[in-house]
Structure formats: C-alpha cells, structure tokens
UniProtKB/Swiss-Prot annotation:
Residues 602-626 are annotated as: Disordered. The chain crosses the membrane at residues 8-28, 104-124. Residues 29-103 are extracellular. GO terms for cellular component: plasma membrane. The keyword Cell wall biogenesis/degradation does not apply. It is an enzyme of class 3 (hydrolase). This is ATP-dependent zinc metalloprotease FtsH 3. It comes from Symbiobacterium thermophilum (strain DSM 24528 / JCM 14929 / IAM 14863 / T). Its cofactor is Zn(2+). PANTHER family: ATP-DEPENDENT ZINC METALLOPROTEASE YME1L1, METALLOPROTEASE M41 FTSH. Residues 1-7, 125-626 are cytoplasmic. It comes from the Bacteria. SMART domains: AAA. Homohexamer.
C-alpha cells in the first residue's frame, strides 16, 4: 500500500511541475513575438520601438503598440551600428543587462518540456501495461482455486443424511490415503466420480468432505470458468488445470456444474458451440490421458446428467456415477441435528417432529430453515430458538415470505378467502387418501391471500390413482365452496386449477391411468435448445387420440370438481362453521384445528387396503387405483 502511495505521489509531483512549467512558457510565448534583426532595425527607424534591453546576443523590448518582442542579435563586434541607431532616437528607452542565458534556457525548456512530458507518459503507460501484460499472459491459465486451509476443513461428520453416498466415497478417500494397497493388487481407482441430483442435496459439500478426509489439495472450479469468448482459452485452461493438479498430486479436482462445459456436442442451433466443444474435447483427452497412479481424482457435480456428452460418461472417465437424492425422514433428522449445533434451542424443540414436517426438503433447505428460525428468534429479542420460531420459519419457507398482516383487505375479499380455504379443509378432511390437515390461515403471505397446509406423515416415492384423484378433489374444494356459498366464482382458484389440470394430463399421457386410452405414454418429452437436445419432436399420436386425451383430462377434472361439490353440499354446516371461526381467529392449526373438524365432521374414511385379485386366471397383487 505504501509503495503504491509513493508511486502515485511521485507521478503527481512530476505532473504538477510539468503543468506549471508548460503554463508559464505558454503564457510567455503568447505575449512575446520573436523578431528577426532586420525587422528590429525597421521598427527603430519607423519609431515604433518604445524600449529595448540589450543582453549579449539577445535583446528584448516593447513596441509602441504594447507588444513585447525578443530578437537574436549579431555578434558583439557587429552591434555598434545598432547602439548608434538607438542613441539617435532619444524617445527609445535603452538599457543594458549582463549577458545571461535565460533566453537560451527558456527556449530550451520550451523545446524539451513537451518531449519530457511525452517520455513520462510513455514510461507510466509502460509500467501499467507491464502488469496488464502479466494478466494477459494469465488469461489462458486455469481459474481453479486451491483450498488448503485446515481451519475450514470439511469432513464426513459435517455431511449428514446420505450415509450410502458417504460409503461410496469412502473408497476414494482410502485410495488417496493408501494408494499402494490398491496398486499392488492391480486395482484401478475410478478416475472420475459424477455426483448428480437435485439442487441443494450436498454435492459440493460432499466433494469438500472427501478432500478434507483424505487430507489432500482440493482444486475447485466451475464449469463456466473454462469457456470464454476467445477461441482456445477454454482448452488452455483445462491443460493448465491438469498441470497444476499433477504438481500437487495426490489431489482432488472438483468441477461444479459440469454441464456448462460437458454438454452433448453437435446440438442446438448451428450444430453446437465451437469453443465449448474444443474445451470439452481437451477435457476428455486430459481425463483419459493421465495414468491411475498419478493420484488425481476428478469429482464433478451436476443436476442435469441427461445433457452430458456420452463420451464424458464412459468408463475410464467418470467411472462412478452417484445419485444424491433428497433425504428421507432419517436423513432429515440427521441434517437437523447437524444444523442445530451451535444454536441455543428451547426444550420444546423436537427435531424428530420437524423432520416429519419437512418431507422433500434438501440439506440446503433445512440449513436455510434453521437460519430463518434463528433470525426470527433474534428479531423477537429471544435468547433461545423455540419450536414456534421453527414452525413460523417452515411456514415462511413453504408459503413464501412473511405474513402480510398490514395489508388492507376488504370484508368481502376476506370472507371469500375464508370460505375458499374452509372448502379445502372440509373436503380434504373427508378424503381417505389425503394427508393430515396441519394449518389453515387467511392471512396473506407471498402472493397468496391465504393457504391450507396438508403435511404427509411419511415419505412417498409412488402415488396411486386414488391418491391423485383425492388431491385433485381437495384442490378444487376452494372453487366449489365459492360456487356453493356465493353462487359466484373468483380468480383465486387459478393455481388450484393449474395444478389439477396438470395432474389430470399426466394421469392420461404419462402414467397410463385412463381406462379409455390404456397404459400408454402419449407424446415425447420436449427438451429446450439450451439443454443441448433436439429442439422439438413431433407428437406420436393422431388428432383423434389428441381429442380423446383432452376428453379424458376434462373427465378427470370434472369428476374431482363434482366430488368436491357433493362433499361440501353434504357438510354445508361444517363449511359455514369453519369459515366463521376462521374469520374470527384468522389462523387455525394443530390440535385446535383437529378438534374443530372432529366436532363438525364424521371421522375420515379409511383407505381400502390393497387386495390380490384374479387376472387372466392367475393371482397377482394389483392396486385397485391403478
């Protein structure tokens, strides 16, 4: 910092002095006229000279017009005629000065200052470009960051909820620690490991944990850091990355979002992207070029493995592909325990209950949830995080944004919202395959005027036809309540209708749940151009079948809507009572909500158990919903 300050001060001083000299010389040159000797003689004879000072080989003076002048005189031996001429004109003030070289210096400075300024400017520019030149030379270098700080080392203890994945990667760690054990047996450790799964499931954290457990250098780079607008830069960076890795082997090279550079070649508009494909080609060569005993392991992460080039996924490059999915109940509990460390919790905080309340949450979601709970507790001036803080944080994450209690809502809209949400609650309570009702509120949050929250009690990986129809019926319960109560419908059911239509179409075209169309898939999945797949594909069904698909979708939606109408018509009193209580309290949840529904409605019907039935003379276990 001091060196930079001294350099700036030096250049500023030079600049100020140069400007001052230039201004002075510029001012003098603007007021003084350079005359030749013959002009001076003529002006003297014409009486146009007011004063003159002789100083050796130079003379300076002033004309009658006020204009100042300088003139170079002949040698001293030839100046006698000039002196005699001046003495003959007594009106001219004559003066003599000792010979000095001020005129010479003035002319010299006037000539040299611009040159000096140009040289200084050139020197300054060269110094600046010297650093820039280094940056230019670094342009083709890898941007990988070497992580070696032991204080921030991540281990497998920091990763929870994905024990099976950690077991897969433990082999990589053991190889990095004891490579001879594998090499003596002729074993070849996987050169590359591809981690793929939904965002937030811990792919990057796992890669850091592998490096932390093995205690080796960890290079981290994003796939987008390779490709630039200049041709050849990406390939150069790939080469430099592997050169650095070889110097620090054994080590781990982690490429995050590898789909940015590893996308399938020759796809999209124009046949692909030349620079990206060159970079990918170089990456393929480097991954297949180094031998197993060099101790370099590539770990890559992506949430779009389907768009990667097949050559990148073949054995010898990414030998091992590991799916990292959303954690189950046991995994979520372990993740909650990790993120609860270091946070003061009230005794009422039950992590197991929270794990049950958050199905589908990833590790990143849970980390964000606990952070939101801590922020809410701090905002409420608490010393510890309570269960209510975490519950409010869950609602904030699920519903989007804080409660908007300050929003001014008319009584009419508030009443419509109350009946809409009560319709969801009553219909959902009377459906056998619906999840338990957890909360209902008419306080706006995010873009919603209110919401009804059903929470599953277990993780599900398949869903039956009966469950889908129950969800569709519950979703349309709000619209049905509006029509039954007010005889008028609103736009508040827009999201409900979109979800219901989407479910119905997938039942017909993807899941084969239509009796009329049978167990067939209709229509090819269309991938966008930027996903490096074909831009579009023709549908694989006729116009007649398209009409049948629309008819079946309409049938499923109308069936669900009529079912919701029937339930609310039968339990109209319960709809009215729940709406009144909701208008009074605005939010109902937990035991209070369950007690109210059990008081107003009969017990929820239990789903029919799956029973074997005879199919074609044999016995097979078939779900009635399918």
């Amino acid at each position: 910092m001091n060196k930079l300050f001294r350099s700036l001060a030096f250049y500023m001083l030079i600049l100020v002095i140069s400007v001052a000299i230039a201004v002075q010389l510029g001012g003098t040159s603007q007021q003084t006229t350079q005359l030749v000797y013959s002009d001076l003689v003529r002006y003297i004879q014409q009486g146009e000279v007011r004063s003159i000072t002789l100083s050796g080989a130079y003379a300076e003076g002033e004309l009658v017009s006020g204009e100042k002048f300088t003139v170079q005189l002949p040698p001293s031996s030839s100046q006698a005629p000039l002196v005699e001429m001046l003495q003959q004109h007594p009106n001219i003030k004559l003066d003599f000065r000792q010979d000095n070289t001020s005129g010479i210096w003035a002319m010299l400075l006037q000539t040299l200052v611009p040159v000096v300024l140009v040289l200084l400017a050139f020197f300054f520019i060269m110094q600046q470009t010297q650093g820039s030149g280094n940056r230019v030379m670094q342009f083709g270098k890898s941007r990988a960051r070497l992580v070696t700080d032991d204080r921030k080392r991540v281990t497998f203890d920091d990763v929870a909820g994905i024990d099976e994945v950690k077991e897969e990667l433990a082999e990589i760690v053991d190889f990095l620690k004891h490579p001879k054990r594998y090499l003596e047996l002729g074993a070849r450790i996987p050169k590359g490991v591809l981690l793929y799964g939904p965002p937030g499931t811990g792919k990057t954290l796992l890669a850091k944990a592998v490096a932390g457990e093995a205690g080796v250098p960890f290079f981290s780079i994003s796939g987008s850091d390779f490709v630039e607008m200049f041709v050849g830069v990406g390939a150069s960076r790939v080469r430099d990355l592997f050169e650095q890795a070889k110097k620090n082997s054994p080590c781990i090279v982690f490429i995050d979002e590898i789909d940015a550079v590893g996308r399938q070649r020759g796809a999209g508009y124009g046949g692909g992207h030349d620079e990206r494909e060159q970079t990918l080609n170089q990456l393929l060569v480097e991954m297949d070029g180094f031998s197993a005993n060099e101790g370099i392991i590539i770990i890559a992460a992506t949430n779009r493995p389907d768009v990667l080039d097949p050559a990148l996924l073949r054995p010898g490059r990414f030998d091992r592909q590991i799916v990292i999915d959303r954690p189950d109940l046991k995994g979520r509990l372990a993740i909650f325990q990790v993120h609860a460390k270091g946070k003061p919790l009230e005794p009422d905080v039950d992590l197991e209950v929270l794990a049950k309340r958050t199905p589908g949450f990833t590790g990143a979601d849970i980390a964000n949830l606990m952070n939101e709970a801590a922020l809410l507790a701090a905002r409420r001036r608490k010393k510890k995080i309570s269960m209510q803080d975490v519950e409010d944080a869950i609602d904030r994450v699920l519903a989007g944004g804080p409660e908007k209690k300050s929003r001014v809502i008319s009584e009419k809209e508030k009443r419509v919202t109350a009946y809409h949400e009560a319709g969801h609650a009553v219909v959902g309570h009377m459906l056998p395959h619906m999840d338990p009702l957890h909360k209902i509120t008419i306080i706006p949050r995010g873009r919603a005027m209110g919401y009804t929250l059903f929470l599953p009690v277990e993780d599900r990986y398949n869903i039956s036809k009966s469950e889908i129809l129950d969800r569709m019926t519950m979703a349309l319960g709000g619209r049905a309540a509006e029509e039954i109560t007010f005889g008028e419908i609103t736009s508040g059911a827009q999201d409900d209708i979109e979800r219901t239509t989407q479910w119905a179409r997938r039942m017909v075209t993807e899941w084969g749940m239509s009796e009329k169309l049978g167990p067939l898939t209709y229509g090819m999945k269309q991938d966008e151009v930027f996903l490096a797949r074909d831009m579009t594909r023709l549908r694989n069904y006729s116009e007649e079948v398209a009409g049948l698909i629309d008819e079946e979708v309409r049938k499923f939606v109308h069936m669900a809507y009529q079912r919701a109408i029937d339930i609310l018509t039968e339990h109209r009193d319960a709809l009215e009572k729940v709406s009144e209580v909701l208008l009074e309290k605005e939010t109902l949840e937990g035991k209070e909500l369950q007690d109210l529904l059990e008081q107003l409605l009969p017990p929820r019907p239990k789903p029919e158990p799956l029973k074997p039935r005879m199919v074609g003379g044999g016995t097979s276990q078939v779900a009635p919903a399918f």
